[in-house]
């Protein structure tokens, strides 16, 4: 019925069974097709992930909106279809003006976009260095990426930055064939639709992470539709894509490498449906649990000198960006230090 992520008081609830979500007094009730019921205390819920057919009414929506709880929807093929987000509770007109100002000013936009790429490419390099030190010969890929990174400071437009980012990722993805112990024949990233096991796996875990980043943005005063590296769009929360780039090597890629190298995911984990590769339900649940466990992993922050989770690192990144936008402190993207 449920797959519950996380170990803290507030949790993500992944709903794999068809059914109904409804408000019952001051709690949430899930009723499946067999009329089995489970009550979910509202204070336990961070967000809902609907991986099935689900019914709910405006009474339920109004109730979860009071608590700022989003719902993320996935289709039969485990493709993300969208999110319901309550009305923003943390609003700052001053910050919104500054966000837009830093987008419309090309120099200010490039400065932020470049820093996203600096962080992402550094963390990619650290991943390669990590596996190079564990018996994988990745020196050639490391040298190529290091050479490309040297030119980032010279770039003065977003399109060229995206070009460098694409070239760095192309080299990085070529190295996956060495990092992963299975025969994966991974040549390039294909998204719409993903055409093989690796692309399907990347798409699913990326999407899980995008929604988590969006949730962290929502807890701050940032507007998730105003972005700097990715072009803002009428149909996506593009700032979550920007911030995700910095953390994907640590959270998404490391998780995928672990799942594949432990043979928790193989070609048998997928079902072919027409031109799509669909994750089996039990495999999807496994990935969700491993993903949530990774987000809850604790490290000691080098500057704060206190223990925080990987997920909270994302919130800190939002706060750092806010300080930059308000002119308090120049934004420096997250870079792995361990």
Curated annotation (Swiss-Prot):
Enumerate the UniProt keywords alphabetically: Antiviral defense, DNA-binding, Endonuclease, Hydrolase, Magnesium, Manganese, Metal-binding, Nuclease
This entry's Gene Ontology molecular function terms read:
DNA binding; DNA endonuclease activity; metal ion binding
Q: Where on this chain does Mn(2+) bind?
A: 165, 230, 245
Q: What is its EC number?
A: 3.1.-.-
The record ties this protein, via CDD domains, to:
Cas1_I-B
Which top EC class is given? hydrolase
Q: List the coiled-coil residues.
A: none
Q: Highest taxon of the source?
A: Bacteria
Q: Name one GO biological process term.
A: maintenance of CRISPR repeat elements
Name the needed cofactors: Mg(2+); Mn(2+)
- What is the role of this chain? CRISPR (clustered regularly interspaced short palindromic repeat), is an adaptive immune system that provides protection against mobile genetic elements (viruses, transposable elements and conjugative plasmids). CRISPR clusters contain spacers, sequences complementary to antecedent mobile elements, and target invading nucleic acids. CRISPR clusters are transcribed and processed into CRISPR RNA (crRNA). Acts as a dsDNA endonuclease. Involved in the integration of spacer DNA into the CRISPR cassette.
Family statement drawn from the similarity comment of this UniProt entry: Belongs to the CRISPR-associated endonuclease Cas1 family.
Its subunit composition reads: Homodimer, forms a heterotetramer with a Cas2 homodimer.
Q: What is this protein called?
A: CRISPR-associated endonuclease Cas1
Which lineage do the record's taxonomy fields give for this organism? Bacteria, Fusobacteriati, Fusobacteriota, Fusobacteriia, Fusobacteriales
